[in-house]
Amino acid sequence: MKCPLDKNDMIMVEHRKIEIDFCLECSGVWLDSGELELLVGVLNAEGADLHLNELLSKPAGQGKWRCPICAHKMNKIWLGKGAKILIDSCPLGHGMWFDAGELQKVLREMEPAGAPANTTVIDFLGTAFQATHGKDSKG
């Protein structure tokens, strides 16, 4: 799959049967439809019934990047519960694009308040993506 930003080939990283497409050049992440819900479910087993519709806002307008699957221009949407993050989403529902660091921010935002969250996925993402660039794990 090609990166929507720089058109470079992305690598596929798999964790707990969730495929994450990662661009080595810009550090962006593509999640196919349904994969964000799977990541949220891994983070918070009790909140696994959380639906993506609860986290999405209405589109904030059309973005300039195209979906790597269907080539339609993606919509800009706000994602999250509190401190929302502006991401790109395919208008046909193929998936979502996260610029460098945005996926980790969204996942941290979705951690349950006051409960020890399973941060394995966030730690894995940070370590895997930083390792591909030879960076240390400071964050």
Regions found by a protein language model. Give the residues of each.
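Short cysteine-rich clusters marking metal-coordination/redox-active sites
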Residues: C3-D6, C23, C67-C70, C90
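Short metal-binding segments enriched for Cys and/or His
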Residues: V29-A45, H94-E111
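Short, intrinsically disordered terminal segments enriched in charged and Pro/Gly residues
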Residues: L38-S57, L107-G139
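Short functional micro-motifs and their immediate structural scaffolds
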Residues: M10-I11, L31, N75, F98
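Residues immediately within or flanking Cys/His clusters that coordinate Zn2+
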Residues: I20, G28, K64, I87, ...
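Short, flexible, mixed-charge glycine/proline-rich loop motifs
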Residues: M12-K17, E54-R66, L79-K84
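The feature marks the first
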Residues: M1-D21, K135-K138
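Short Cys/His-rich Zn2+-coordinating modules
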Residues: P4-M10, N44-L55, A71-K76
